[in-house]
């Protein structure tokens, strides 16, 4: 796996946002983590980034499509997002 778009739930637009914050590989993304990547995207690229984008990042980090994230993880992400 060499491209960001090889990760589950990462399409061209989200990959482009990750590249704009300096993340160009799946390894860099995993090192940074979903929440930190989301914060940087919101701060530097897209201040309107939503919960769905956060879930996509979390799915990519876990290696699954966002629809397959466990309900507990989705609830955790929602609580975290609402606290921003």
Where are these regions (language model features)?
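Catalytic DNA-binding helix-loop module of base-excision-repair DNA glycosylases/AP lyases
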Residues: 13-21
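Sterile Alpha Motif
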Residues: 1-8
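Alpha-helical interaction/regulatory segments in DNA maintenance proteins
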Residues: 38-67
């Amino acid at each position: 796996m060499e491209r960001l778009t090889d990760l589950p739930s990462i399409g061209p637009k989200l990959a482009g946002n990750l590249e704009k914050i300096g993340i160009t590989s799946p390894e860099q993304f995993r090192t940074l983590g979903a929440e930190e990547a989301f914060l940087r995207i919101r701060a530097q690229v897209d201040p309107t980034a939503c919960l769905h984008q956060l879930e996509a990042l979390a799915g990519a980090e876990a290696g699954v499509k966002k629809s397959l994230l466990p309900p507990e993880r989705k609830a955790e992400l929602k609580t975290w997002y609402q606290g921003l």
